């Protein structure tokens, strides 16, 4: 399974649409910056058919150290980003591909 990096994404979009990579890089970086800013402010990002990104509060909890299960580990409350895939994405991911 391959990893799609920002560099690969820029290259692919640049080739597909015959746009200079620097222009694509600027747009993608701006898009990522705006998404990050929105999440930091607590906004919910919804992309129809793709999914939803939102900040959730994780409650504090007690965990276990696998090397010494007798000693509890206190995990503090924190904020985290949660991604919920959209219907179309779920359907596409659940459908096996020919290469699988």
From Swiss-Prot:
The keyword DNA-binding applies. GO terms for molecular function: DNA binding; structural constituent of chromatin. InterPro entries: Hist_DNA-bd (IPR000119), IHF-like_DNA-bd_dom_sf (IPR010992). GO terms for cellular component: cytosol. Gene3D superfamilies: IHF-like DNA-binding proteins. The keyword Amino-acid biosynthesis does not apply. GO terms for biological process: chromosome condensation. Keywords: DNA condensation, DNA-binding. It holds the Pfam family Bac_DNA_binding. Belongs to the bacterial histone-like protein family. Histone-like DNA-binding protein which is capable of wrapping DNA to stabilize it, and thus to prevent its denaturation under extreme environmental conditions. This is Probable DNA-binding protein HU.
């Amino acid at each position: 399974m391959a990893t799609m990096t920002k560099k690969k994404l820029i290259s692919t979009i640049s080739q597909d649409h015959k746009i200079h990579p620097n222009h694509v890089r600027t747009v993608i970086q701006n898009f990522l910056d705006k998404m990050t800013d929105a999440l930091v402010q607590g906004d919910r990002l919804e992309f129809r058919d793709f999914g939803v990104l939102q900040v959730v509060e994780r409650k504090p909890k007690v965990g276990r150290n696998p090397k010494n299960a007798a000693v509890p580990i206190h995990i503090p409350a924190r904020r985290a980003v949660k991604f919920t895939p959209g219907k179309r994405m779920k359907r596409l991911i659940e459908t096996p591909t020919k290469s699988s």
